[in-house]
Amino acid sequence: MPGVKYNAPMTPAVRPPSIFRRAFAVLGWTDASNVLLGGFFLIVFIIAYIWWPLAEQVIAYIDWRGQWWLYFDWLLVGIFLIMTLTIIARADLRRDLLIVFVGMCGGLVIEAWGTRTNLWHYFTAERPPLWIIPAWPIASLSIERITRLFNWGIGKVSHKPEEAGPSGSIFFKWSYWIIFIVFFGLMLPFIAPTFDEPYTIIALLLCVVLIATPTDYRYSVLTFLAGTGLGYFLELWGTTRQCWTYYTFQTPPLFAVLAHGMAAVAFWRAGLLVRVIWGKLVDRLHFRRGNAPDPEI
């Protein structure tokens, strides 16, 4: 009969991807995600191993023989899961190693400033404690992912070309100045008791320079919001568990929450500066190699 094919080759059945593969695809899992996730768990293991007495104090609060779920630190677990999921999303080692480097250096500077000026102190009385420093680059990676998600979402829903551009619309320009002027207004009275400290003056001047020289209004606002959002839960956990305490004894102070947004913007701007400097160094090195005399002549 016409149109009927005999002995047609059988096509193999295509199995749908497993739920794990679909989840990895949604998260944007890459080869670099394996490296970052392994490094993340390695840092957690090292901290728990070296500072095991601190981990024992946390575990001791839980009554494992009774209603342990009432004493379990669900907030910490939630923060841990959010950070884990975000740092593996669309991971790129070339970009992320710079974020880790800037976050580590910046976190060390911020913790040294805060603990040495007694704006806050840790229950271990270290100034600053080394075990808290790795939290900064991990948070920086998480904030970078959240910011890119915000930026992607705005690009999807925006129908105006100027809103999808690098600088953003007039809305982001106004939002930028309102947000950072309010932040600076909260910063001054909070750090006023330490105006006699050189660290505070340097921190204040750095904030003034960063605020007064915006490079991308939209991305600055989104980074600030992402840092503030994550910073709220970090500060809520740390201050209510008395892991660290501010001199105002607030749990947490509004300025401390917003300061995470400012730190995120500062780290992002520092990363841009490092890229520019590194690019110029590489170009100059290549230029010198290109103009070097041939030893065989």
Q: Where in the sequence are the language-model features?
A:
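Aromatic-rich, lipid-facing transmembrane alpha helices and their immediate juxtamembrane interface loops
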Residues: P2-I297
